[in-house]
Every structure is written in C-alpha cells, then in structure tokens.
C-alpha cells in the first residue's frame, strides 16, 4: 500500500481509507484512490451535559471519528442540568461529575494526534439554570436545581457588569485548556419572558434604545464576542443569534435551511446541523440526502418529503417545527462578503442517550453524515448506502449494536 499526501492530516485520512478497505474480506487486486475533503469542518456535537460520558468513552468517539475522516468534536459542556468544566475561577460551577483539566488536556492531545480538533461550548445566556444555583447574582433571582430535560427559562442578566467580569474569567479558563481557535458561545433558546419580567432590564432596554429582547440578546453577544476575541479566539453560536447588527460570528444552523441563508446574507460563515440530528430516530438515508450547500428550495423539498415519510410518522409532530422557521426565508442571490458554508456537524443530544446506548445512536448513522461532509456533491450513491454502512460498522468499536446484543444476552436471547 502506497500513501501519498500533501499534509500530515491528509496522510491520516488516507490511512483511514486504507484501513477501511483492508478490513473487508474481499479485496480488489488493484485500486487507486484519489481523495480530498469537500468541507473544512466535518464535526460532531456531543452533549455531555444531560448525560455524562466518561473520558474513555470520549476517546472511543475520537477514534471512531478519525476512521470516518471527521475533524471536529464539539463538546456541549454546559446546560441547565449540569456543568462539566472545572473552572478554577468559578469552582462552584462544576457538577459532581465533571472533567478535570488533566482529563480534558488528555482528550485534546489524543484528538490532535488523530487530526480531531476539540471545540468547547459554554452555552449562554440561556440554558444556565445550573449556573444560577451556584451564582444567583448572575441572574434575576435564585433558581432551584433541576435534572429535568427540556427548555428552562432562566437566563443570565445581560445588564449586569458583574456577569461580564465573571464570563471574562470563565472563558479565560476555557481558553487555557482548549487551544482550538474557536469557542462556542451557545446563544440558543433564550426565554424573552425571563428578561421581560424584570423592571430593571426593561428600563435598561429603554435607556439604550432596544426595541426587543432580540436587541438585548445581540448586545450580550457583542460583549461576549469582544471577550472571546480578546482571548485570541473566534466565536461560534447557534442560529438564534442572527441579527442585522450582529458581530462577526460563525453561525451554527439548526432551525431548518432558512437560517443558513439568513446567516450567509448577513455575511456570516455557517455550519449546517439542521438535517443531522442523531438523537432523533431517523434512518441514515434521511440524513444522507441533505447536502449542506444545496439551494434552499431543494432543502425545503427534502424537509417536506421527510414529514411525509412513513418511517418518520412517530416523530412527525415534532418535525413540523421546521415549517415554522420558514417565515424568515430569504432569496439568497449571493452571500455577503464571500460568506460560505464551512461544513457541518451531526448533533447528538443526550437527554435520552447514555454511555450504554451511545454506540447505537452514534455509529449507526454518523458514517452517513461523515460521507456527506467528505465526498463531493456528485456522490449520491444512496442505493448502496446501507451496504457501505455495514462495512464501516465492522471497523468501529464498539459495534453499533453492542448494546442490543448485550440486552438480548441478558434475556437469554441471541
């Protein structure tokens, strides 16, 4: 086997291809493969807040991603239920189950050796119920701890300078552990009612000419981006941060294709995640059909077809929200300022996923997303997708169906 590559990372990806090829029982007598990635950002967002995944599990995830030629593990470290990062500046934030600095540095080094960047997410100003149990002065009033999943209304108070001083310390702690050029700042599912109930906040908005809580959220983002850039990092945030006056920020799209094009029209680079939610029980071919750079009408057609897919009727009601976000659709002629889709991320939210069920949810479909992000737009071999998946599964550890096999064995079945 002869491997030629222009970079170390290219050599790693070529070795992954060779490993997959050599894992098959029947090998061609001769073959030549010329390959390169289509997108720069080929990632997985893993929620470690709702359920905690120990370090050995994360290392297995990185190994599998390397075999799939992916290159970004986005760790959703914080949420309403838990805070998995140990901040020296704010030690009360850390949940009982959290990652030590040594563990995270080990993960970063392990990923780097395999061409996998580790991008941390500290989600704010919403999804901070756990924060406010530790430091109630950052919000409007104390809140009770919760392990119930779903959207909780508690938010940071963006009018208090003490909040920005705290975030400067926290993000500095994050930057010292994670060397990647990006820090994900969250920004999703902010409850306007939480801010509107405060006379002090509504007065602040009036004094500063803010017509809506979206303007207030954008003020918070501007302050947060300034802190992030001051640390020599670039910001990423979920697509709720879209605003005509938003600062430069890599936007992660999750609310349907229209927010992707809104970001591009504002001159913001974009990551696509909307069609790649692995915690939902979609067949792999549904994920595979979506092209991150396809035109808006093609994407909307696929969304509508998914709503009618008989295999998805068990989640059809939940999928209907994709139509709600079309209200802001734009006719994108040319992205502003050369903005582009940098790639995409599959997302695995862990409300109903734990270390035992992770292999099934992750490896059964992530290879399909990985191929979509790596291969050219003309690669549409959907008829043989499941044959390719079966071949890929044999190279992954643990096998996607390990959990089911163990449960069946416990029942005396095979």
Briefly describe each language-model feature range.
Residues 8, 40, 89, 130, ...:
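Residues in intrinsically disordered, low-complexity segments of regulatory proteins
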Residues 124-126, 188-192, 241-243:
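Short, internal active-site loops enriched in acidic
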Residues 188-210:
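N-terminal leader/propeptide and maturation segments of large enzyme subunits in energy/redox metabolism
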Residues 106, 161-182, 203-414:
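Substrate-binding groove of N-acetylhexosamine-processing glycoside hydrolases
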Residues 83-84, 127-130, 193-195, 245-246, ...:
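Extracytoplasmic/secreted cell-surface and envelope-processing proteins
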Residues 1-184, 198, 223, 227, ...:
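Feature activates predominantly on carbohydrate-active enzymes
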Residues 76, 83, 91, 185, ...:
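Residue-level signal for alpha-helical context at structural boundaries
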């Amino acid at each position: 086997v002869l491997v030629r590559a222009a970079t170390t990372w290219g050599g790693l990806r070529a070795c992954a291809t060779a490993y997959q090829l050599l894992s098959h029982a029947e090998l061609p007598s001769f073959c030549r493969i010329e390959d390169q990635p289509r997108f720069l950002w080929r990632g997985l967002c893993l929620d470690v807040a709702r359920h905690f995944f120990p370090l050995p599990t994360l290392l297995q995830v990185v190994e599998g991603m390397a075999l799939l030629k992916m290159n970004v593990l986005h760790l959703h470290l914080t949420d309403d239920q838990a805070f998995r990062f140990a901040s020296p500046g704010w030690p009360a934030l850390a949940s009982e189950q959290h990652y030590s600095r040594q563990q995270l540095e080990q993960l970063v080094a392990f990923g780097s050796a395999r061409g996998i960047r580790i991008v941390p997410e500290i989600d704010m100003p919403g999804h901070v119920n756990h924060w406010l149990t530790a430091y109630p002065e950052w919000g409007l009033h104390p809140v009770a701890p919760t392990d119930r999943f779903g959207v909780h209304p508690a938010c940071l108070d963006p009018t208090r300078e003490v909040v920005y001083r705290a975030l400067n310390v926290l993000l500095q702690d994050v930057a010292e552990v994670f060397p990647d050029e990006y820090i994900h700042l969250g920004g999703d599912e902010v409850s306007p009612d939480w801010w509107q109930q405060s006379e002090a906040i509504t007065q602040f908005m009036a004094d500063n000419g803010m017509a809506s809580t979206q303007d207030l959220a954008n003020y918070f983002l501007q302050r947060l981006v300034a802190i992030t850039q001051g640390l020599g990092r670039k910001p990423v945030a979920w697509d709720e941060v879209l605003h005509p006056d938003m600062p430069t920020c890599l936007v992660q799209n999750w609310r349907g294709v229209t927010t992707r094009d809104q970001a591009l029209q504002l001159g913001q680079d974009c990551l696509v995640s909307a069609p790649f939610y692995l915690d939902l029980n979609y067949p792999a071919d549904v994920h595979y059909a979506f092209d991150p750079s396809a035109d808006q009408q093609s994407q909307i057609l696929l969304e509508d077809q998914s709503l009618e897919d008989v295999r998805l009727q068990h989640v059809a009601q939940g999928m209907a929200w994709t139509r709600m976000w079309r209200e802001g659709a734009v006719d994108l002629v040319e992205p502003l300022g050369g903005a582009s889709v940098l790639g995409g991320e599959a997302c695995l939210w862990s409300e109903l996923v734990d270390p035992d069920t992770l292999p099934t949810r992750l490896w059964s479909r992530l290879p399909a997303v990985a191929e979509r992000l790596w291969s050219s737009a003309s690669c549409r071999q959907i008829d043989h997708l499941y044959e390719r998946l079966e071949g890929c599964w044999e190279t992954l550890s643990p096998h996607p169906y390990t959990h089911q096999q163990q449960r069946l064995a416990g029942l005396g079945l095979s």
